[in-house]
From Swiss-Prot:
Tetramer consisting of 2 isoforms Alpha (catalytic) and 2 isoforms Beta (function not known). Disulfide bonds: none annotated. This is Aspartokinase 1. Substrate binds at residues 25-30, 52-54, 79, 130-131, 155-158, 299-301, 355-356, 369-370, 376-377. The record marks 7, 79 as: Contribution to the catalysis. Its EC number is 2.7.2.4. Diaminopimelate-sensitive. The gene is dapG. It is an enzyme of class 2 (transferase).
Length: 404
């Protein structure tokens, strides 16, 4: 049985126009001899009646007494409704289709409600239904515990659902349909001449996603990479095959992946930088501070440690809490709000001299101050003022000639 997984997000399934475009992609796959496992998100975005955020808004405020287990019962409804509506549309258009919930499709998760982890896939029922249908529509974002409690698997969960299904059924491709032409060299809303990339590696797309590119969930990429199932990031509104995400840039197995220096530029805004000076005679400031942040549920990013101070960033909405904790501990932090993290990602930078110099020079020419920097084997990050984010992203996109 030749299987393809196709995932359609909220904007693709929110109305009849989007669903009909999705229908075209499904029929094309069927005509190519595939059985199609369709994964759908809830219909629309916040403000639309069945979107996840809209359902969450039905609860009585942020401090609702409802348990996470009960929240999952509510949150999973959006995808369940979407799967049935989508299946009805397929049937009305001559596609032999059936709908399954995440649990029915074999998603077994732990009991970490609202952010559950998939611990096993049991696709036997899915295979059975697929044998007698052209397409099976699976509600994304959801699963169930061994006790049968409904769970949801966190933000980006429908991407993760598609990847887990692709791995479980040994799909030829996992198609992630979005509203753009594939993985872009930068956010096209920030860089007008951003270009779609024909091929990226799993590592590159993971890094782009973790650094702010919202085209696909990094959890989904990690699952597909482990199973060695290629992903295609495609546009719902086009017949183009989009961006292929695989283990290497070239179709030639064993070829070098370093022919492209920088793959893309990503960014994250609304970041706050903290500089925490060490107390006199104190040598473990980072241990004390990071432990306090973790205990408060604050994720620490982009940190540098010196004998005299530690520097790190937090999400903007955690600023007040983080500052209060530090002051209660007797520290007097220097706080810089309204920052942005700009990242240059590419497998080709590993061991190549001059890349950081090129970034520094490009930003200096635009008179953009760098507040902090760091690097890894495949990514170089800089922290800038948020007001400088757009010119910084454009400067790096230009200096690495990503529009060519």
């Amino acid at each position: 049985m030749k299987i393809i997984v196709q995932k359609f997000g909220g904007t693709s399934v929110k109305d009849d126009k989007g669903r009909k475009l999705a229908l075209g992609h499904i029929k094309e796959a069927i005509s190519e001899g595939y059985k199609v496992v369709v994964v759908v998100s809830a219909m629309g975005r916040k403000g639309d009646p069945y979107a996840t955020d809209s359902l969450l808004g039905l609860l009585y405020g942020d401090q609702s007494a409802i348990s996470p287990r009960e929240q999952d019962l509510l949150l999973s409804c959006g995808e369940t409704i979407s799967s049935v509506v989508f299946t009805s549309m397929l049937l009305d258009n001559g596609v032999k289709a059936a709908a399954l919930t995440g649990a029915q499709a074999g998603f077994l998760t732990n009991d970490q409600h609202t952010n559950a982890k998939i611990i096993e896939m049991k696709p036997e029922r899915l295979f059975s239904v697929l044998a007698n249908h052209d397409a099976v529509v699976v509600a994304g974002f959801q699963g169930a515990t061994e006790k049968g409690d409904t769970t949801t698997i966190g933000r980006g969960g429908s991407d993760t659902s598609a990847a887990a299904l692709g791995a479980a059924v040994d799909a030829e491709y996992i198609d992630i349909f979005t509203d753009v032409e594939g993985v872009m060299t930068a956010d096209p809303r920030v860089v007008e001449n951003a270009k779609p990339l024909p091929v990226v590696t799993y590592t590159e797309i993971c890094n782009l996603a973790y650094q702010g590119a919202k085209v696909i969930s990094p959890r989904a990429v990690e699952i597909a990479m482990q199973a060695k199932v290629p992903i295609r990031v495609r546009s719902t509104y086009s017949n183009d095959k989009g961006t292929l995400v695989t283990s290497h840039h070239s179709s030639k197995v064993g070829s070098d992946v370093f022919e492209r220096l920088i793959t893309g530029i990503a960014h994250v805004k609304d970041v706050t930088q903290f500089k925490v000076p060490a107390k006199i005679g104190q040598y473990n400031v980072q241990t004390e501070v990071f432990k306090a942040m973790a205990n408060a549920g604050i994720s620490v990013d982009f940190f540098n440690i010196t004998p005299s101070e530690i520097v790190y960033t937090v999400a903007g909405n955690k600023t007040e809490t983080a500052q209060r904790i530090l002051m209660d501990m007797g520290y007097d932090p220097m706080v810089t709000r309204n920052c942005a993290k700009v990242s240059a990602v590419g497998a080709g930078i590993m061991g190549v001299p001059g890349v950081t110099s090129k970034i520094v020079s490009a930003l200096s020419e635009k008179e953009i101050p760098i507040l902090q920097s760091a690097d890894s084997h495949t990514t170089i990050w800089v922290l800038v003022h948020e007001a400088d984010m757009v010119p910084a992203v454009n400067a790096l996109h230009e200096v690495f000639e990503l529009s060519k």
